[in-house]
Amino acid sequence: MTGFRDQLGVHAQALVLRETRNNLLTSNIANAATPHYKARDIDFGAELARASGTGTLRTTEARHFAVGGPAARGEALYRDPVTPSLDGNTVEMGVEQMEFAENTLRYQTSLALLNRRISGLMTAIKGE
């Protein structure tokens, strides 16, 4: 028998990560005029793999290197600008708005899939 969390699949984890990414992107947009502000983001694919356990690497020998770094620990990374500004701010409004719109659409999709999954579970529980 599997647990409730297993029944929700990856959608619940994706929803949490999309919300985290949305917060970072809105912070970037809000600080577009702040001198020396560095735009931040997460590597969604890597974070989802880490959260779902599919991205773990196994070492088979003592001489293997451990994988680390900010992305492996779930930290926000700084984005390198295509055209840096003179005041040191790395926010590129067009990039941020596009990433925000895409992330919001994917958040809504994950939410709809999660709602459908929960509705299916409720139907199974009620025996309808």
Curated annotation (Swiss-Prot):
CC annotations in GO: bacterial-type flagellum basal body, rod
InterPro entries: Flagellar_basal_body_rod_CS, FlgB
Major site of localization recorded for this protein: other
Keywords: Bacterial flagellum
Any one Gene Ontology BP term: bacterial-type flagellum-dependent swarming motility
Subcellular location(s) per record: Bacterial flagellum basal body
Source taxon at top rank: Bacteria
Function: Structural component of flagellum, the bacterial motility apparatus. Part of the rod structure of flagellar basal body.
Quaternary structure note: The basal body constitutes a major portion of the flagellar organelle and consists of a number of rings mounted on a central rod. In Gram-negative bacteria, at least four rings, L, P, S and M are present, whereas Gram-positive bacteria lack the L and P rings. The rod consists of about 26 subunits of FlgG in the distal portion, and FlgB, FlgC and FlgF build up the proximal portion of the rod with about 6 subunits each.
Family: Belongs to the flagella basal body rod proteins family.
Entry protein name: Flagellar basal body rod protein FlgB
